[in-house]
Amino acid sequence: SELARPLTANKQLVAVLCRNDRFTLTADAATQLHGHAALMLDGSRPVGEQVDTLTAYRPDWIAGPPGTAEALAEAAAVRDRHELAGGELVSLSGSDAPMDPDLAVLLGTSGTTGSSKYVRLSAAAVMANAGSIAEYMGLTPVERPVTSLPLHYSFGLSVLNSHWLVGAAVVVSAESVIQKGFWEAVRRNGCTSLAGVPYTYQLLERVGYRELDLPALATMQQAGGALDRRLTATYHEHMQAKGGRLLVMYGQTEATARMAYVPPTRLSEKLGSAGRAIPRGELRVEEAEPDIAGRMVGEVVYEGPNVMLGYATGRDDLARGDELGGVLRTGDLGYLDEDGFLFLTGRSKRIAKVFGLRVNLDEIELLLREHGPAAAVAGDERVRGACAFGSEEELAQLRTALAQRLHVHPSAFELVRVEEIPVTSSGKVDYRAVERLLRSS
């Protein structure tokens, strides 16, 4: 392609400033097809704010929108600039540090927090995950998904890769699901599927999605965190009524994107489940102990060909090979039911101590979300909840109900009314921003 022409035969690191546009899709595809490695960055953030990442990884090239070279002038030594349709390819001083021949993609783990910790993915892992997704979804060349998620986010990128693998077209929209132009593009192009995280589904409720006339849209995908059971059931029933389906899935960037899914035919009976392992993957629970309900809860471990090579925090780490051997300790807690379906109960790191008791913050958050948008974080000897719903009286009643359910004093909880729950660019709860919001309230 025109974009790949300036790149040398030696393996190069290309930082892609990802936006939902054709240039980003071309940059990603050209980089990987020619054996180079793509560092996927959030293109909605000014490049000047990403200097720490660029300094840590010393990319050889940056593929970004028009004006990228100018924006970089003060932050990096620009050697050359190639104008292309929809963007530009900027040559930097780069690095002579070797890279693992298998390395294909670097994806961030931190949303918008600015961490330089990235997941190293091989081309084989990307292809394996795309193949598994295409298989369990039954994808064909007539599919036509729309870019409803950022492409620097593993879920958004996996939608692209899995559909490209079967020869399907992808409809590119830079607009949000709350904008009229997005739905006009969906209708005009006959889009067949829409992917979203829990926050996306909250926005869909806001725009009255279920009243929209979208006859071609037969598949909805949900991942990126637990969607509350009420909304899951609502969208499952809505899609069933129109002859479509809702696919609930579970994954991590460390496993390229997806590790489990709930077959739509089992969704009603397995409401709340993260699903069973994707084709060629295996889920198990290790170091399990009985919880209050007598369920054997332990750390979720995933094994499969889509597991990352390892982490990186800078350019020198890119020479490292496969450090995990296809086995990922997810850090998630959960249990498997008698049919092998996974139910998540929280994160091993999302545990708070309240009056000497261990309290699962994710469990609290799910209980709060039954009433509306919410997030839970740890405070001093209590759980603090940010709630974008309810009056002062209603929150006081909810606090009492939580205390009774968990057999603790109501003072173990502080629920604060907020305008909205802060989210990252990928639509997940931004817990650092939640903590700042609660400190200022």
Predicted regions, residues:
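AMP-binding/adenylate-forming catalytic core of the ANL superfamily
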Residues: 16, 304, 309-310, 331-411, ...
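Conserved pre-ATP/AMP-binding loop-to-beta segment of ANL
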Residues: 83-108, 114-115, 138-144
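Conserved AMP-binding/adenylation subdomain of ANL enzymes
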Residues: 127-144, 152-193, 278
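Gly/Ser/Thr-rich phosphate-binding loop
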Residues: 191-196, 205-269, 282
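Conserved AMP-binding/adenylate-forming
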Residues: 2-44, 148-149, 358
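ATP-dependent adenylate-forming carboxylate-activation enzymes
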Residues: 2, 18-19, 39-54, 66-68, ...
